[in-house]
Amino acid sequence: IIEGGQTMNPSTEDILHAIEKTPAEIVFVLPNNKNIIMAAQAAAELASREVVVIPTKTVPQGISAMLSFDAAMEPSENEAAMTDCLSGVMTMQITYAARDSDFDGFDIHAGDYLGLCDGALAGTTREITTLLASLADKAAEAGKEFINIFYGADIQESDAEAALELFRQHAPDAEVNLVSGGQPIYYYLISAE
């Protein structure tokens, strides 16, 4: 695991160092950020061992890819399985606006909650439950069957439990789970598959 974040992208050297200190003969790298994929691919070319880069763009994609890994399969089979699962992952995030702006037809004010769905702005509001309901509806409309809600460091467990119930109401056909992710910046990271 390499520490990073939205503004702390690891370099090719950081990734290569992590690869080289791993005792595995074959290393799978999950960037979990579109801005890190090229650095991971460059590190893979420089590594002294076999490296497979799975082009994960979000943490939910990375989790899904990890769950698709099977130690009994050949590396090429794992690469195919891990990569194939990515297209079925809907990634939703709730964060906040740092400043006033207009974007994609949304009038955004500093402090507003921002809802993102697969990287696109899906809504903005002062009321987080409105945004959660909207994202739950998107998952239900897309026919997603498994939803994992990772709540961040700034969310109280009772609020996260309320979000879980809201998702269960809006997406009644899905299995919905709640996990304390403890992540900064994002109040919620939501994976729907």
Please report, for each region that a protein language model flagged, where it lies by residue:
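N-terminal loops that bind phosphate or other acidic moieties
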Residues: 1-193
